Amino acid sequence: MKLLMLCREPRLYSCQRLKEAAKHQGHEMDILDPNHCFLKLSQNPPHFQIFYQENSESKPYLLSDYDAVLPRFGTTSTQMGCSVLQHFEGKGTFCLNSSQAFLNARDKWKSLQLLLKAGIPVPNSLLSGGEVQAQATIPHISSPTILKTLNGSQGIGVILAEKPQSAVSIMEAFKQTNISMLQQDFIEEAGNADIRCFVIGDQVVATMQRIGQNGEFRANCHRGGKTEKITLSDEEKQIAIQATKAIGLDVAGVDLIRSKKGLLVLEVNASPGLEMIEKTSGIDIAAEIIDYIEINAFINSR
């Protein structure tokens, strides 16, 4: 197969592992930056054309057809990356994950709405309009409170407000910059630990526990969190699979937290990193992803 990965940083561990796995299984993979693409719609066939310009000095060229596309772009490239995905979808190419699912996952509030609508437990959460006074929301959420920007990743834009007035001050400061924030209950009993599940299709292929270090409440590996192996029950795995399906994703990193009320879904990541979970679990996740693409790209082509 001829595969395309949409990625701005081809040297990243995850991108290199996926390219190695594809090559090992006899496939060719190109890695291209979606921000170097331009898209053309035409009434005459071919209706969907994608051109690529390597740099400001080079001449754009028309991209050839691919059997499958893997989106691995970050939050700053979501809009253009998903537009490129939509163009490939228009051409009938199998995309892992779809553009709509990617957009769902990148919007934290919409993700929570979709999860709760599907009956999946999430922390109590609030989102308020720009004209709502921050003080008015305080009685409706726990203290301490977690504050999150709507489009952050890797723990960036996540703040713990220890006291109600601290939450008010932080929200009012962000409001001045037109950045919306959601509020969530702080799950104190979980301490500084959460669980990452790697879901492919209808299977949890790997899990790990992440533990924040040196008083850091965020357990994200990018924030220095320590990882260790963890075994989940079938019921807990099923929640991760259901969360992935609720967002519409084929492949996802699902973040879970154990609370007094049971397991809660914190977030569903459309482009989860491979490095720490592969090293912690010892599982070749990259090969599992390529296997999934082989099957589904073939089904899509029939």
Swiss-Prot record:
Annotated residues for binding of ATP: K148, D185, F186, D194, R218, A219, N220
Residues involved in Mg(2+) 2 binding: E267, N269
Pfam families in alphabetical order: RimK, Rimk_N
Sample GO molecular function, one term: metal ion binding
A Gene Ontology biological process term: translation
Alphabetical UniProt keywords: ATP-binding, Ligase, Magnesium, Manganese, Metal-binding, Nucleotide-binding, Protein biosynthesis
Cofactor binding, per record: Binds 2 magnesium or manganese ions per subunit.
EC number assigned by the record: 6.3.2.-
Record organism: Haemophilus influenzae (strain ATCC 51907 / DSM 11121 / KW20 / Rd)
Cofactor: Mg(2+); Mn(2+)
Residues binding Mn(2+) 2: E267, N269
The ATP-grasp domain, residue ranges: 112-294
Name assigned to this protein: Probable alpha-L-glutamate ligase
UniProt-listed HAMAP family: RimK
Top-level enzyme category: ligase
Signal sequence coordinates: none
Residues that bind Mg(2+) 1: D255, E267
Entry GO CC: cytoplasm
Binding site for Mn(2+) 1: D255, E267
Family label: Belongs to the RimK family.
Entry-linked InterPro entries: ATP-grasp, ATP-grasp_RimK-type, ATP_grasp_subdomain_1, RimK, Rimk_N, Rp_bS6_RimK/Lys_biosynth_LsyX
